[in-house]
Design a protein with these regions (language model features):
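Exposed, low-structure sequence patches enriched in small/polar residues
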Residues: 1-170
């Protein structure tokens, strides 16, 4: 089991970062018979010091703050958000990977117009299911299905994806 974290300071006070944002998590990798299980639980908080809004991702001099053309440069949810996510992945003996990921997030609580990723305050609840496996020698197929419920949006997000990994050596 591992613990990890990140603290980003928007300002400096006494030679140390202040006005901090946080990311933290715990992950595990375990054997389960001939299979393996990987998992993690992670939390993000892009409010300043876990409470102050309209500060870390904005700036009175640099008007774009921590955004580039309206999209967040750091955490994808942008400033003043809170997120908790968890994932469990089963890796079988024949190298198939089955996974489930759950997400709960509160984004843009102050309706900041700069945040084009999430232009309005919203609460998101999502689930993602995945499978990947070797389909020909070392060629791998990755698939995913997801659904995200948005409380304050006209539409929820539903999708599917597929990708192929083809290894090569240089």
């Amino acid at each position: 089991m591992s613990f990890y974290g990140q603290m980003v300071g928007e300002d400096e006070s006494g030679y140390l970062p202040s006005a901090n944002m946080f990311l933290g998590g715990v992950e595990g990798h375990h054997g389960w018979g001939k299979d393996a299980v990987n998992w993690y639980v992670e939390a993000h908080d892009t409010r300043t010091n876990m409470s102050r809004t309209n500060y870390s991702y904005t700036h009175h001099i640099y008007k774009d703050g921590y955004y580039q053309q309206g999209y967040p440069l750091g955490d994808a949810m942008g400033g003043d958000g809170q997120l908790i996510a968890g994932k469990v992945e089963l890796i079988t003996e024949d190298n198939q990977r089955w996974s489930t990921r759950l997400v709960y997030a509160k984004v843009n609580p102050e309706d900041q117009s700069i945040n084009k990723a999430f232009p309005h305050a919203d609460t998101l609840k999502g689930v993602q299911l995945g499978w990947s496996g070797d389909v020909y020698q070392s060629v791998r197929l990755n698939t995913s299905l997801w659904y995200t419920n948005a409380n304050n949006s006209d539409s929820d997000d539903v999708g599917a994806s597929a990708g192929i990994e083809i290894p090569f050596s240089l």
